[in-house]
């Protein structure tokens, strides 16, 4: 699956609400901040068919050189792209979440640069944890 433009979280409004009162958990070296967004309430300019709006951040304070930050961003983005299909299937097959959209912000929390394999393990663990949290809310 491709990582398309309509999957990217670009709305500063949604990003600020994410950091004010969203759910979050860590899977070292990553931290996921997520929030459920009602698709109907979004302005037309932000609406997309994608069930997940995705953004990521690598801290400038930890990685001074832009080259290092860009390498980590590429690794995270590629790992997410390779693993998102399982997550999309879960959301599209569940009637409760057919009209919902989720905003994801992935923060890199590691102090050193990790390889793609280690980042991929973190993304897989993160997706697994998110699925468990969703299933827990479905049962309620």
Range-by-range predicted roles:
Residues 1-140:
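Positively charged, solvent-exposed patches that mediate nucleic-acid binding
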């Amino acid at each position: 699956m491709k990582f398309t433009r309509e999957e990217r979280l670009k709305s500063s409004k949604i990003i600020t609400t994410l950091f004010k009162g969203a759910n979050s958990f860590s899977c070292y070296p990553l931290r996921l901040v997520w929030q459920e967004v009602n698709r109907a309430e979004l302005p037309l300019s932000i609406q997309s068919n994608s069930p997940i709006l995705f953004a990521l951040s690598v801290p400038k304070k930890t990685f001074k050189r832009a080259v290092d930050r860009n390498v980590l961003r590429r690794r995270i983005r590629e790992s997410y792209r390779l693993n998102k299909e399982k997550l999309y299937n879960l959301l599209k097959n569940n009637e409760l979440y057919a009209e919902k959209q989720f905003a994801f912000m992935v923060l890199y929390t590691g102090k050193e640069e990790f390889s793609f394999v280690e980042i991929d393990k973190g993304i897989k663990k993160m997706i697994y944890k998110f699925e468990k949290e969703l299933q827990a809310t479905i049962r309620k």
